Amino acid sequence: MLYGKQLSACASFAGFLAVAVCGILPVLAQNSSEDVHIQPRVQAAAPKEPDIDPAFKTHTKPLKVDVNMVLVPVTITDPLNRLVTGLDRENFNLFEGKDQQEIKTFSSEDAPVSIGVIFDMSGSMGGKIERAREAVIQFFKTANPQDEFFMITFSDKPEEIADFTSSVDDIQGRLIYTVPKGRTALLDAIYLGVTKMRQAKYPKKALLIISDGGDNHSRYTEGEIKSMVKEADILIYAIGLYDHYFPTEEERLGPALLSDVTELTGGRAFTIDNPNDLADVSTKIGIELRNQYVIGYRPKNPVRDGKWRKIKVKLSPPKGLPPLRVYAKTGYYAPTE
């Protein structure tokens, strides 16, 4: 996890801190718009009206990946939790089950992303809402002009307040008029976010969850949501803002819930206790999405049996580097057709 002191230290740098081996660069999150390498977007047309039923009464057909090519986004960090760039194809080894796979494609380019923001508007967010809104704004500043976004807010139930759009201003404008109230239907909001992402136009997809607690008002269970995100080819990131001194029961369970859900997808969960750190963490997540490796392989097992197949990415880093950590999705469901 990235704690407040580390974030402050990272944010004070003006650029990148070079690792003196083989040109490997740990990428640090920045605060100001001048520090972001992507230029601001041009205003786009207003989004269309949402067409997903907010009641989402029934499960939809599980997502399946094309068994002929599996794409695995990978994030690498150093012991100080900084992003590590500059690695090559030969530094990665990928396994499906016990069988090593041949890497067919390898990229570290900044590709457009379809992004959904899941924003907690429950009553307990009342004193933190302005910082949380600022965090969303900072996250958007790391986007590139081709990205598309949608936003879901949730309290007693989730609500899609902005359909897919490239207009950051439109989403920010809608967020201003939301009022914190009610309980926390986090799991239902994740369900709606994953369902909505089926309309995404880009192969790379990500959800960002901003919440101050666990769940206390959802119809879907934790097990159902974990099964769903395993079926979806979506990176999930989360920022959990918790009171470590007087936590509620939901807050005590919240960090583990977010960590478990994000880990399945190759994303990460960040836990903080100071609302002032929200903007720094959201910027870090945005930059991380721009500095990932994407590995593609064709499974040696061609059987279309619909079964869960475990994935493991291992590193063979250049000599002299400290221990590095790998974040990647844990597997995928093979198709049946």
Model feature map: region roles:
Residues 2, 15-18, 297-300:
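Compact, basic/aliphatic-enriched, mixed alpha/beta core segments that act as assembly/interaction modules
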Residues 1, 28-29:
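Generic low-polarity alpha-helical segments
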